[in-house]
Amino acid sequence: MTIWVDADACPNVIKEILYRAAERMQLPLILVANQALRVPPSRFIRTLRVAAGFDVADNEIVRQCEAGDLVITADIPLAAEVLEKGAAALNPRGERYSDATIRERLTMCDFMDTLRASSVQTGGPNTLSPRDRQHFAAELDKWWLESQRKK
């Protein structure tokens, strides 16, 4: 089992939670990004730098992740691909992706794209709240416990 992080877009506060979790769970944590990242020294934490470009990091995560792994991403198409491989996917707000939530999110993305194409300003997501961080940490622990039961 490995935790993969779509690190270019992952908030720093979530990365900090993941660093502590990797140590506690003694699980490999791999942060994939197209830029250099600073991570704490650990035998469990490493970075994987990929070339800059559209979906390069996403494609590398899909290529390397396996069934039973966890992928941290806010990217819906990436989440859909890793679910197909048998991995779990969790967004930085602590929402666990499923086939149903992926379909719902893709529909919403299409709708928002239509609004933006019509020159409607839609804004971006809200900043992460302390509640979001707590929810993420709780869902991460829940995934860990579920994966331990399957062993």
Curated annotation (Swiss-Prot):
Superkingdom as given in the UniProt entry: Bacteria
Under InterPro entries, the record lists: UPF0178
Q: What is an example of a Pfam family matching this protein?
A: DUF188
PANTHER family (UniProt xref): UPF0178 PROTEIN YAII
Q: Which family does it belong to?
A: Belongs to the UPF0178 family.
Mind telling me what this protein is named? UPF0178 protein YaiI
